[in-house]
Amino acid sequence: MRNAMNETWMAGKWFDPRAAVLICVLLMVAIAATQSACAAQAETAPLRVAIVGLEHGHVEGFLHALPAHKDVELVGIADADPALWKKYGVKFALPDTLFYKSMANMIERCHPQAILVYTPISEHRHAIEIAAQYGLPVMVEKPLTISVEDALAIRNVAREHHIEVLVNYETTWYASNREAYNEVKQGELGAIRRVVVHDGHQGPKEIGVPPEFLGWLTDPAQNGAGALYDFGCYGVDLMTWLMHGETPLTVTAVTNHDKPEIYPRVDDDATIVLTYPHAQAVIQASWNWPFSRKDMEVYGATGYAITVGADQVRVRREHDAAERLMTAPPLNKPEDDSLDYLAAVLSGKIEPKGDLSALDTNVIVMQILDAARESARTGRTVRLTRVGE
């Protein structure tokens, strides 16, 4: 007998339990190492993104920035216009194999992990609905869509298919806006009393946007409105963020057609006034500014913060003898860039709820813009109640 060796007779051979334990341990270590390696590979693998639509001029900014994002891989582009394939293919040395006429075909062949939409605003809902069928998250250019009806439909499909829908605004990545927000959050300005936002430029035709962009930008059926939507959305988004998603009590808007010979179908200047129980916002959106601008003034009960460009703020607090100009602290990664932010949301590092890009914020933005359009049309103030959750 080999009791001293703790051996057992099995299947006609001697079997050592200690060897079995060792083998099990080694297998567990190997499996853990494999899983760790796979997780690390997934963590470092580039995010596979696809573009839908080339009619939006902002797609050029994305393609310019793409080479700096080694953690992002463009795997496909869907657009029905071969002339735009050629335009961007030549300009950015993109291979012909990237381009598809059908969004669904592109998704099935390229297997992206996220969709970036650069279509006319009116097509956002359709693109999101297709992406949802494949369980793919979507980032669209501002604003979310052209009506509150579409916004609610997008929210429903996002919930049904458990996908993220984000909205990209240039001003989200301004350190100056974050610093103004932090001044309020930290109590340096007291309770918000008044916010004034200015956004716009000399006009899309005046600054030379490409014809495929200008065509839909000046069509109310495709853009929702003119300057009212194109630039009013920035201030509405910022105010909704500052107010932590509170719906205003009333929306009043007036629009002008100062250049009807250039923009006969849409407004080129708009002012939106939002009232809250203890605060007011005045949003001035225009295609008639003498220069491009995106700035915000936040006035509290005891101080103010006025943004200057993307990274400076003029601040005066309660006991300051005069205002001071400060450089806003740089935004921390991944909240300093749309693609980094998208990747962080998809990996679970960021919960977007309440953010400038978040769907819940932008459903409220669309409710306000829709009401502003109606107010401008009728000449009456529109009273709001929060849309159902």
Residue spans for each PLM region:
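Predominantly a Rossmann-like dinucleotide-binding segment in NAD(P)-dependent oxidoreductases
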Residues: A45, G57, T172-I262, G379
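Contiguous beta-strand/loop segments that form the cofactor/metal-binding neighborhood of enzyme cores
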Residues: G235-Q312, L339-E351, A371-A372, G388-E389
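N-terminal secretory signal peptides that target proteins for export/translocation
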Residues: M1-P17
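Bacterial N-terminal signal peptides
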Residues: A20-T34
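C-terminal helix-rich "cap/oligomerization" subdomain common to oxidoreductases
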Residues: Q41-E43, A114-L116, A344-E389
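Beta-strand-loop-alpha-helix segment that lines the small-molecule cofactor/substrate pocket
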Residues: R109, A114, P120-I121, R125-T172, ...
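Conserved SAM-binding strand-loop segment of SAM-dependent methyltransferases
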Residues: D96-S102
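N-terminal Rossmann-like dinucleotide-binding module
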Residues: C38-F92
